[in-house]
């Protein structure tokens, strides 16, 4: 029997983690909670799905290594990551970025006791790191790339950065990454990046792997195809490592899985090629239009503002003023509308998120408009 999950919304009660909130939304047509891509297929993507029988046959006939190599070549090339180490077994395919994160966390736990982690960020990252016994030191995202991180870097073995960040959309610039990687190299720290939202923001399409390689630091990057395309969660999370990482990533990977489905890899290749042929630019326009739907739909509501005016990510934060985000969430649930309250993103200080909601933008226009109207109504009633 499937477990029933509830998330109480009363003040002072345990509200669970963000994935539990997202789970509650899965069966609602007005789910704007999770950041998975749930919009309609484009015409080009629909043709790929129509060709699934041929994709299956191709995946069955070709060597797995060839299918995997073509998939990550198409995906990494699409996003400007031309220096990724694709030819020497350092790109490990996982079922999801969370599986990649679990493998990385277990690898780190045997080599260090503490990790500096960007703040805020999605709470499954700190949950997984803490779950293997690591202590966490929060680093405000605006400090990353600065020269004065000595107070943090002297006490940790790894620095973990989400870029673009979830939920803020902030991108660590090429200059900032180079500076941070240099500091990690000087102290022999591991620099770990989660780039799951990279595809949405051209500012994140500079060649991270070139910067990391040239810095001389030990590094790990988690990539994720699951946020970009509405493939019903058929996706790949890649775990990419430096040659001199010095952590048992490959061994722990082999403890957990053999690989991912070649058919999913073939699907990722085709969707990447479609994106390179104009689909990615179309996606950027689509997300921008949906962001405008939310901002215009909430215009004039007293007390609200949008904390991330320059975000290109497929999520949008809404600050609800003096209102409680949990109370707004509860009111929306009465309309069968689901968003994410942001307390748990602020994993080191949850009250910082008490008045903020996160809205997913990778949705078809009609349900997003309906959900935004309901949000406006609930906000005006409070």
Question: Where on the chain are the PLM-derived regions?
Answer:
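N-terminal small-domain helix-loop-helix segment of the aminotransferase-like
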Residues: 6-99, 103, 381-382
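Conserved core of the PLP fold type I
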Residues: 58-186, 198-220, 325, 368
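Short strand-turn motif at the edge of the Rossmann-like AdoMet-binding core
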Residues: 195-197, 224-225
């Amino acid at each position: 029997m499937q477990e029933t999950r509830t998330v109480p919304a009363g003040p002072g009660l345990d509200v669970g983690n963000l994935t539990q909130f997202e789970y509650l939304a899965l069966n609602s047509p007005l789910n704007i909670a999770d950041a998975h891509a749930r919009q309609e297929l484009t015409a080009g993507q629909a043709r790929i799905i129509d060709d699934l029988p041929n994709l299956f046959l191709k995946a069955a006939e070709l060597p797995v290594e060839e299918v995997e190599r073509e998939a990550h070549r198409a995906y990494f090339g699409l996003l400007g990551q031309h220096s990724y180490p694709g030819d020497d077994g350092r790109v490990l395919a996982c079922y999801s970025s969370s599986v990649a994160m679990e493998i990385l966390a277990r690898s780190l736990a045997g080599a260090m006791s503490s990790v500096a982690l960007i703040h805020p960020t999605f709470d499954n990252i700190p949950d997984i790191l803490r779950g293997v016994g690591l202590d966490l030191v929060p680093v405000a995202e605006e400090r990353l790339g600065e020269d004065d991180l000595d107070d943090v870097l002297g006490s940790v073995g790894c620095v973990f950065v989400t870029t673009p960040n979830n939920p803020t959309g902030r991108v660590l610039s090429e200059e900032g990454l180079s500076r941070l990687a240099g500091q990690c190299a000087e102290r022999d720290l591991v620099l770990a990046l989660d780039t799951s939202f990279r595809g949405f923001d051209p500012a994140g399409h500079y060649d991270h792997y070139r910067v990391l390689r040239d810095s001389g630091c030990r590094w790990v990057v988690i990539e994720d195809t699951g946020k970009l395309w509405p493939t019903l969660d058929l996706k790949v999370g890649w775990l990419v490592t430096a040659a001199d990482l010095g952590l048992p990533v490959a061994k722990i990977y082999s403890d957990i899985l053999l690989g991912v489905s070649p058919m999913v890899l073939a699907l990722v290749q085709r969707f990447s090629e479609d994106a390179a042929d104009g689909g990615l630019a179309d996606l950027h326009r689509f997300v921008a239009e949906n962001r405008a739907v939310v901002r215009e739909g909430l215009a004039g509501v007293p007390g609200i503002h949008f904390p991330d005016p320059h975000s290109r990510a497929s999520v949008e934060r809404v600050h609800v003023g003096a209102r409680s985000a949990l109370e707004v969430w509860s009111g929306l649930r009465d309309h069968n509308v689901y968003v994410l309250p942001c307390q748990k993103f602020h994993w080191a200080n949850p009250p910082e998120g008490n008045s903020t909601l996160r809205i997913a933008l990778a949705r078809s226009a009609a349900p997003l408009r309906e959900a935004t109207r309901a949000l406006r109504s609930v906000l005006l009633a409070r």
